[in-house]
Amino acid sequence: MNTHPNIVHDHVGAQHTVPQVAQASANRRAFTSIETLKSNVSQSDALRKFSSPGPASILRNLRLGPLQRIAEVYVPFHLYRVDYDLGREHQARFFAIDAVEGSLDLFEFPAIPQQGELIQLETRNALPVTLNDDASQKLMREKALRLIFQQGFFKLRDANVTTTRIRIDLHRAYWLAFYGNDTARCRVLDATRGRIEGAKASALFESWLSA
């Protein structure tokens, strides 16, 4: 069974409870120091989520094989303060957008994350920042407007929205699940929200895995 050379995996099964380093490779990613939101999903919780029974699980096992391994990975995010006016009421909200492609759902904070909400760690499983500031700000504005409209605030004017980057080191954790011998495709669990993500999240991580 081959594992991706750049991922540190947790193998499924009682005999592999300690995270194992993937097969040695000359191009293994170096450790990097990051600050990340504390995960709300433990390794055992992630295993239960990925292994939950049901028709979809049966079909997936038939198509891909059984769950073999999981890996916790970290995605960099850019944090913005988004200001806008609704009538006479001023609103200020804090949204984070992934700094890889800007394709993941926005994550909203009630306020700027404080030091006690973040942990510092060293990991090989951190995606790089590839989204520049201009592209990040443009995508944030578009996504924030769309989200606000979806929440029923149709009278908001585009010109009333301003976005301000809050420069902090911020990552969020995700669990990836690999089935059978397939290391190119994965399922994704958001370790903050505790939910299984859809196709766009899988595509983001699969692109990183194949790079």
Name every feature range the model reports, one short phrase each.
Residues 195-196:
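Hydrophobic "anchor" residues
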Residues 2-184, 201-211:
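Charged, low-complexity helical/coil segments in non-catalytic cytosolic or luminal regions
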Residues 190-191:
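Short, acidic, Ser/Thr-enriched surface-loop or helix-capping motifs
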